[in-house]
Swiss-Prot record:
Annotated glycosylation sites: 26
Cystine residue pairs: 22-59, 31-51, 38-44
Record-linked Pfam families: Attractin
Cross-referenced InterPro entries: Attractin, Attractin_sf
UniProt source species: Aplysia californica (California sea hare)
Record key words, sorted: Disulfide bond, Glycoprotein, Pheromone, Secreted, Signal
The protein, known as: Attractin
């Protein structure tokens, strides 16, 4: 069950990045919607938080890579 949830979370992460939408409000909504049918009463909040953390980290990495890729050295 947790493996399926993780796979779905990764698919959601890819979909959000495809849109380049890293707004925390959107991330929260997407994770909550993705896991709305969670059956683990004690673990659902944790799963949603892990989803959000993963998506935020990927957004930060994407922003860092974009910034690094746009840096040029020498005359332009």
């Amino acid at each position: 069950m947790k493996v399926a949830i993780i796979i779905l979370s990764l698919a959601l992460v890819a979909a959000v990045f495809a849109d380049q939408n890293c707004d925390i409000g959107n991330i929260t909504s997407q994770c909550q919607m993705q896991h709305k049918n969670c059956e683990d009463a004690n673990g659902c909040d944790t799963i949603i938080e892990e989803c959000k953390t993963s998506m935020v980290e990927r957004c930060q990495n994407q922003e860092f890579e974009s910034a690094a890729g746009s840096t040029t050295l020498g005359p332009q």
